[in-house]
Curated annotation (Swiss-Prot):
This is NAD-specific glutamate dehydrogenase. Probably involved in degradation rather than biosynthesis of glutamate. Its main location: other. It catalyses: L-glutamate + NAD(+) + H2O = 2-oxoglutarate + NH4(+) + NADH + H(+). GO terms for biological process: glutamate biosynthetic process. The active site is at residue 124. It is found in: Cell surface. GO terms for cellular component: cell surface; cytosol.
Length: 445
């Protein structure tokens, strides 16, 4: 395999799909050497097959707004690969949603799910719809319309969607209700459900908790004392909220959150129940701003239109969206003495930023490893649904802690390069090898 030849082919077949092509190139560069050591991969056309989704569904989603006007959005479901288990991945409702973004997310999801060691394939879906500014009734009508088309292509052993940006417990509940009505079954077809009807303990916190567990393992592996360190995070939703809680519990001081309007710096730390509650209130307000934080905690400062990466801290964890941390941000963090960056959003760093961290031997881990706690907890929810059991917080947290430790160990095994651990390479190779071997064993299909 030659990466450039594959990329030239993909660029010709999928012009304009920049996010998807970026994700594929990162993986191919990491796995090229090990791929060429396995002639059975070449014989079975693994690369040519693994970079194309099994199937893609595109459909219109008509719904009626509160003024009685018919609105139409575009819905998608990308079923990328089910070699190791049923398709599994979230649904995103955001105006930016397009096929390139969902293919990139589905491609990443395939390897992320492989890292968890749970039997889950990769998929992703969504629509170019924003719940922000919509009434409760409008959101319900949209979710129900979306599911009337999606339901026939999903199922507990086929494809199990979950939440993502713009899709929380409320939206999952509305979609599950319509699925249940259409399919006439109450099964674990969606995860991220409310606890009252089949959801798992710790699901809202799991991505953030898992990310901090991964950072904890990175620190232990590399001889870094994390207690007392300062941490800059972006975002203010579920992921950032989970990170702030677990980091505080482990003695790490979170000092920033951010939104589309800018970022907040709190020198006292975002580390009390009142401040965690404030993060949830900011999210639930629907205003998509963080500036109101300083009204409740006046010792904090708000920096309009800026990113939190300019602050001098020890660790950084982007928790908002893809490509939010660019090369200039990476250089600023390095200059300010940041020693560890954990990509907590999906592909939160541009390719140039990721390459800069690795080139400068900084401790840097990619999203497919760091944020796998969310889908891991979804897998645990699937298990509980299938067994008709409910686990306690402690049981779920124990599993989550173990899974994140296992993911870290896989990254170290495949990413160790002398005294340095290339977590990007390690995560990509570990996930790729599991999927590729499963595809070889199952034949060309």
């Amino acid at each position: 395999m030659k990466t450039q030849e594959i990329m030239t082919m993909l660029e010709a077949k999928h012009p304009g799909e920049s996010e998807f092509l970026q994700a594929v190139k990162e993986v191919l560069l990491s796995v090229e050497e090990v791929y060429n050591q396995h002639p059975e991969f070449e014989k079975n056309g693994i690369i040519e097959r693994i970079v194309e989704p099994d199937r893609v569904f595109t459909f219109r989603v008509p719904w009626v707004d509160d003024q009685g006007k018919v609105q139409v959005n575009i819905g998608y479901r990308v079923q990328f690969n089910n070699a190791i288990g049923p398709y599994k991945g979230g649904i995103r409702f955001h105006p930016s949603v397009n096929l390139s973004i969902l293919k990139f997310l589905g491609f990443e999801q395939m390897f992320k799910n492989a890292l968890t060691t749970l039997p889950m394939g990769g998929g992703k879906g969504g629509a170019d719809f924003s719940p922000k500014g919509k009434s409760e009734a409008e959101i319900m009508r949209f979710c129900q319309s979306f599911m009337t088309e999606l339901w026939r292509n999903i199922g507990p052993d086929t494809d199990i969607p979950a939440g993502d940006i713009g899709v929380g417990g409320r939206e999952v509940g509305y979609m599950f209700g319509m699925y249940k009505k259409l399919a006439r079954e109450h099964t674990g077809t969606l995860t991220g459900k409310g606890f009252e009807f089949g959801g798992s303990r710790l699901r809202p916190e799991s991505t953030g908790f898992g990310a901090v567990y991964f950072v904890q393992n990175m620190c232990k592996q590399n001889g870094v004392d994390y207690k007392g360190k300062t941490l800059a995070i972006s975002g203010f939703g579920n992921v950032a909220w989970g990170v702030a809680q677990k980091a505080t519990e482990l003695g790490i001081k979170v000092v920033t959150i951010s939104g589309p309007d800018g970022y907040v710096y709190d020198p006292d730390g975002i580390n009390t129940p009142e401040k965690f509650r404030c993060m949830l209130d900011l999210r639930d307000s629907g205003n998509d701003v963080v500036s109101d934080y300083v009204k409740r905690f006046p010792n904090a400062q708000f920096f309009p239109g800026k990113k939190p990466w300019e602050q001098k801290v020890d660790f950084a964890m982007p928790c908002a969206t893809q490509n939010e941390m660019n090369l200039e941000d990476a250089k600023t963090l390095h200059k300010n003495g940041v020693t560890l960056v954990a990509e907590t959003s999906n592909m939160g760093c541009t390719a140039e930023a990721s390459e800069y961290y690795v080139a400068n031997k900084m401790l840097f881990a990619p999203g497919k490893a760091v944020n796998a706690g969310g889908v891991s907890c979804s897998g645990l929810e699937m298990t509980q649904n299938a067994m008709h059991l409910v686990w306690t917080n402690e049981e779920v947290d124990k599993w989550l802690h173990q899974i994140m430790q296992d993911i870290h160990e896989q990254c170290v095994t495949y990413g160790k390069d002398g005294n340095y651990i290339d977590y990007v390479k390690g995560a990509n190779i570990a996930g790729f090898m599991k999927v590729a071997k499963a595809m070889v064993a199952q034949g060309v299909c």
